[in-house]
């Protein structure tokens, strides 16, 4: 019983000291929070948006992760890497696999 009261007292003391620290150093904390970049982070390099109705060469290049002017060998290698990760037989989405194949076909057909 007394052990629980001691733990509760220590917890309240810690909360009190923490609140006092925050109130006294509010300006420093605000300045530190402003220095942290909000935009960007881990997802800043990802394409925002869905698929277009008719796939463009630029969209196909983004799906495969290659430049729009990539050579056929680079396109084939990129397609293989992306399909290994997203193949429906290994738990990937059939829709994404179809889009990946469509991107490969578009990139290869517009090269020749």
Curated annotation (Swiss-Prot):
Domain of life: Eukaryota
Principal cellular location given in the protein's record: mitochondrion
Gene Ontology biological process: protein import into mitochondrial matrix
Mitochondrial matrix side: 25-112
Mitochondrial intermembrane side: 1-3
GO CC entries: mitochondrion; PAM complex, Tim23 associated import motor
InterPro entries: DnaJ_domain, J_dom_sf
Subcellular localization: Mitochondrion inner membrane
Family, per entry: Belongs to the TIM14 family.
Subunit composition and interactions: Probable component of the PAM complex at least composed of a mitochondrial HSP70 protein, GrpE, tim-44, tim-16 and tim-14/dnj-21.
UniProt protein name: Mitochondrial import inner membrane translocase subunit TIM14
Source organism (scientific name): Caenorhabditis elegans
